[in-house]
Amino acid sequence: MSHSLRTLWVAIVLLALTACASTKKGPEPPPPKIEAPAAENLLHDKTVIPGVRVGPVFLDMPLRKMIEVFGEPVSGTNSRMPGGRPALLYRYPDPGAADGAILVLVREHDQTVYSIQVERIETFRTREGVRFGSSEALVRASFGKPQSVGETTVTGQDGATAVMRMYCYLNGLAVRLDTNGNVEALTAFPGGDLRKICKAQ
């Protein structure tokens, strides 16, 4: 092989190696991390998400974390979960609603949140806009026919009786209606416990 042919061949090989080296990509950068919303971001949130949370308080949240995020409740009483197990009921008043309160039911055996009820507070609402004072029509238009309905007969001071209803949905939302058919309370609960929360239809 002649010297010039050998030089040409070496130049071609070097050129090919250089081309390969320049097209070789370095390691891919890691994908950006998607973080859960920080507790501070949810602190002033007033969204009721069925089966998940009410504002900054989540179902299954440890009691200690709930206090860190939401503060100390004004009262606590012994209670029972729908299945009969011991629980503690904690009450948080709402400064903007004199009769309003947030009631958090905590399992006694593991100190985690079982359900969260918003009573008579207009500022808490579902993504669909259902809130205290909303009509039964809006509830049904937003969530459809309830999977379960509970009824309670109440007697007024004048002796007249009226029926209050509670609509329960598999997504983990219970809606208590007053005697006029308007929303009185919203409760986020584990959807699988629907039949324990409301009497089956």
Language-model features: locations:
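Short, conserved catalytic or interaction motifs in soluble domains
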Residues: 22
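A cross-family detector of function-defining hotspots
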Residues: 39, 53, 61-109, 131-201
